[in-house]
């Protein structure tokens, strides 16, 4: 059976610990897949109502959002940190900083226009979840420059509302697909894989999509 190229769209948020784990498991499946795959990262906000410009320690943010105790939050973070370690990610969630990620997603779309969408997604996830960086404007400019997006372009984009439309388009498309949580993978606009599934689930989905 001839294997055709597979197009994968991934809805993800850069503050989502399971999205980064899902990315690693998906990459393991990609490494073993013979066919050609084109990956496009799409924007999704776990917390679209987070106040813009407010940076809050993630444990405090989660405790308030979920009505959970600090101990419960620490327990949950410990569990996800252990899973992340299995795919080679060293999370520092207790020190991580939550924020409204809309501007970060605009930067991701700017990076995508330079052909750096996947690299940018990786860099911002690592900055938030592993390095516990505060993703304010200067930091977004610096991280984008690190991967090859000129600083003045990022500054210009963040000073206005460029790429806001593209980010909202991703949200609309997610709603059309019925995406309620991330990561969410759509293969050839036909097959959906929800969550940070085991690598073999992604491998199976890739085979299925490739065979049409």
Show the residue positions of the predicted features.
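C-terminal cap of thioredoxin/glutaredoxin-like
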Residues: 3-11, 15-37, 41, 108-212
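Structural alpha/beta surface segment adjacent to cysteine/selenocysteine redox centers
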Residues: 23-131
